[in-house]
């Protein structure tokens, strides 16, 4: 089966100078992939010419006359730039010409245009960016990582439902554990939105294990961690910054003296494995869940190596039938939730996690 992906070549901080080389390298490594390169035709052709890939049959140019800038307001992307590379790329998915879209463009614009073009799955008000973050035994699915800065309690419940469905679909787990990211484990902690979301989650039939904290993200405490996009994006980029700092410190320390350089040579295999594990670029590319089509969001600052990983996220998602499996799991889950109810004031309650004491009134995509 040929995997057909559409690439928003103009998106991100670097545009075609990053997206086109990544696309060329990807198709050369994946003979069953066909990529549609969407954007300003002259800019794309110039990059393909440099790479001697103008005649590559696995690459097709789809012209677009406009570009959504990284600082464009949502309304500009949605209402004024109707022939943007982002919108044309998403239309390829809508029309069935492609099976997934990969973009490094403006996050707010991508979410809004995706919702408009592809529409959301039944019962979902807002898409959410979800990604599998590594832990010692596998991964923890975390959402939202930046699509929704402000959320209502019911949106966090919907994110939990999507996370549940995705892990159930990918891992075959009947009842993935869910945690709500908060400043403490206690039920009384957090702002009103978090408290109300906790009530909704406890009243649902989801396997909600209570609040989790930032230090639980990489421990594997739960299968799914739910948060709003503001908190999630800060947590993600803080993690990436920390990983980069650790790599820089190790490089600096091993380069301090002749002795340390000799030790670095002896430890080189271990250091290379460490570098590979903490290189945040290989974790680039997160799914925009809740849509009737596959959309992968890359970091806007991604280089060609990182963007190639984002393309691979889309490729793997298509090969694994993620969209179809997610839609089925969401449908099955909605029946289950319908039995339990969403009303936090109802009788349906979930058992608290071990060590978590409920108030009387309260009731893993592997690395590509």
UniProtKB/Swiss-Prot annotation:
Record-linked InterPro entries: FA_synthesis, Phospholipid_synth_PlsX-like
Keyword Cytoplasm appears in the UniProt entry: yes
Protein name per its UniProtKB record: Phosphate acyltransferase
Database matches in PANTHER family: FATTY ACID/PHOSPHOLIPID SYNTHESIS PROTEIN PLSX, PHOSPHATE ACYLTRANSFERASE
Protein's organism: Burkholderia ambifaria (strain MC40-6)
Annotated SUPFAM superfamilies: Isocitrate/Isopropylmalate dehydrogenase-like (SSF53659)
Enzyme class: transferase
Classification lineage: Bacteria, Pseudomonadati, Pseudomonadota, Betaproteobacteria, Burkholderiales
Location(s), subcellular: Cytoplasm
Gene of this entry: plsX
Subunit note: Homodimer. Probably interacts with PlsY.
Annotated region described as Disordered, given as residue ranges: 338-368
Catalytic activity: a fatty acyl-[ACP] + phosphate = an acyl phosphate + holo-[ACP]
GO CC aspect terms: cytoplasm
Catalytic activity, EC: 2.3.1.274
């Amino acid at each position: 089966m040929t995997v057909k992906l559409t690439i928003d070549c103009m998106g991100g901080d670097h545009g075609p100078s990053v997206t086109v080389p990544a696309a060329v390298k990807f198709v050369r490594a994946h003979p069953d992939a066909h990529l549609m390169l969407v954007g300003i035709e002259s800019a794309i052709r110039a990059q393909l010419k440099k790479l001697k890939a103008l005649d590559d049959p696995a690459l097709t140019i789809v012209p677009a006359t406009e570009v959504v800038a990284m600082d464009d307001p949502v309304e500009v992307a949605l209402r004024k730039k109707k022939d943007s590379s982002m919108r044309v790329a998403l239309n390829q998915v809508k029309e069935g010409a492609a099976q997934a879209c990969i973009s490094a463009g403006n996050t707010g614009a991508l979410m809004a245009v995706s919702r408009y073009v592809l529409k959301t799955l039944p019962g979902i008000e807002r898409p959410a960016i979800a990604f599998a973050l590594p832990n010692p035994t596998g991964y923890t699915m975390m959402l939202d990582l930046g699509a929704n800065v402000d959320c209502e309690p019911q949106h966090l419940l919907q994110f939990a439902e999507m996370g549940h469905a995705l892990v159930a679909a990918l891992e075959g787990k009947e009842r993935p554990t869910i945690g709500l990211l908060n400043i403490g484990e206690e039920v009384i902690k957090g702002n009103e939105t978090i408290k109300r979301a906790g009530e909704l989650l406890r009243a649902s039939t989801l396997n909600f294990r209570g609040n989790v904290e930032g230090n639980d993200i990489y421990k594997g405490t739960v299968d799914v961690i739910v948060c709003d996009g503001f908190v999630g994006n800060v947590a993600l980029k803080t993690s990436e910054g920390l990983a980069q700092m650790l790599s820089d410190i190790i490089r600096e320390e091993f380069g301090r003296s002749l002795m340390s350089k000799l030790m670095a040579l002896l430890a080189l295999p271990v250091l290379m494995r460490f570098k590979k594990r903490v290189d945040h670029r290989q974790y680039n590319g997160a799914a925009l869940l809740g849509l009737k089509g596959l959309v992968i969001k890359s970091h806007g600052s991604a280089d060609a190596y990182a963007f190639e990983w984002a393309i691979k996220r889309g490729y793997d998602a298509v090969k694994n039938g993620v969209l179809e499996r997610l839609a089925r799991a969401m449908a099955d889950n909605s029946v289950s939730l319908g039995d339990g109810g969403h009303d936090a004031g109802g009788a349906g309650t979930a058992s608290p996690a071990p060590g978590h004491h409920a108030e009387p009134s309260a009731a893993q995509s592997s690395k590509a």
